[in-house]
């Protein structure tokens, strides 16, 4: 049996990895198109996990037996979520997009409450979500002017929200229906097949890059591929653990904009700390500490 502290530690590690995606994706999209870049990234991610799964024959057999779970996770988590995320982000200001995407823990909590009989909304959870979203808004406003105006931006918001819903349903499916499939097999196959689908979509709708791509692009692609392989494998494993609630686990995604903002201050020349951003970071940190205040600090390093 895994301790709650152990689950929290690995959830934080996965979210810290995901927080590096925003800056890295911006670098990659300077040289490549969204669907093509995402497709190649996830194909590589799926292949990177393969050596850590099981024997080839058992791998194929497991996918054949659990093909419905693999298909749903591939479709919802990779294809629908990332297609809508990339396209929606192009239609809205960066700050607004960050807020909408940052509301993912709220969407997941609501969907989990509807689909999972043991994962209901509680007052404590709702308060944590409200403070978490407030923190995301402050971080986003502190980094960029918050605007909402055109109908096209509303379309972008709906696309990002729909992607959040797809992620939520996928998380619930993994929690309820994936107990008979190795989490590394699930992450490897869903990332690989999802990457192929995204790449195939890119062929008729995107022109693709012209000329050779620089070393910077390939290094960025390799990092994003490694990051996705590691983070998704950890997350799928955590979702399968007995007693882990989808909504509670996803509360840790509120730290993604916190660490993302911190990384931007270190990496991006024009980015610097603002009092609104720092306030948002503090609010998110305090809300998570209060929610998990009954978890002993020492358990964070147990059973790793």
PLM feature segments, named:
Residues 65-72, 121-133, 181-190:
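Cytoplasmic-side transmembrane-helix entry/capping segments in multi-pass membrane proteins
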Residues 17, 21-22, 53-101, 138-139, ...:
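Specific transmembrane alpha-helical segments of multi-pass solute transporters/efflux pumps
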Residues 3-7, 31-39, 62-68, 141-166, ...:
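Juxtamembrane helix-entry segments on the extracytoplasmic side of multipass membrane proteins
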């Amino acid at each position: 049996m895994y301790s709650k502290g152990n689950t929290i530690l690995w959830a934080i590690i996965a979210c810290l990895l995901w927080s590096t995606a925003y800056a890295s994706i911006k670098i990659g999209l300077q040289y490549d198109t969204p669907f093509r870049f995402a497709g190649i990234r996830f194909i590589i991610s799926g292949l990177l996990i393969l050596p850590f799964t099981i024997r080839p024959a058992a791998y194929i057999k497991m996918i054949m037996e659990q093909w419905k779970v693999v298909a749903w996770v591939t479709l919802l988590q990779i294809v629908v979520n990332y297609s809508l995320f990339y396209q929606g982000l192009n239609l809205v200001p960066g700050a607004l997009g960050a807020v909408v995407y940052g509301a993912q823990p709220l969407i997941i909590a609501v969907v989990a409450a509807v689909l999972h009989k043991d994962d209901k909304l509680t007052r404590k959870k709702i308060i944590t979500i409200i403070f978490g979203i407030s923190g995301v808004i402050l971080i986003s406003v502190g980094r960029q002017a918050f605007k909402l105006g055109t109908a096209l931006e509303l379309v972008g918001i709906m696309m990002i929200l729909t992607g959040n819903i797809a992620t939520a349903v996928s998380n619930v499916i993994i929690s309820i229906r994936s107990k008979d499939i190795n989490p590394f097999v699930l992450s490897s196959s869903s990332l690989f097949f999802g990457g192929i689908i995204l790449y195939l979509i890119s062929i008729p709708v995107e022109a693709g890059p012209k000329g050779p791509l620089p070393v910077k692009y390939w290094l960025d692609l390799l990092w994003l591929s490694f990051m996705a392989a590691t983070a998704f494998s950890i997350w799928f494993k955590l979702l399968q653990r007995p007693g882990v609630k989808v909504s509670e686990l996803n509360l840790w995604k509120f730290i993604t904009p916190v660490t993302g903002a911190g990384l931007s201050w270190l990496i991006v020349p024009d980015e610097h700390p603002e009092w609104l951003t720092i306030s948002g970071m503090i609010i998110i940190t305090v809300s998570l500490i209060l929610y998990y205040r009954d978890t002993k600090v020492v358990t964070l390093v147990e059973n790793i």
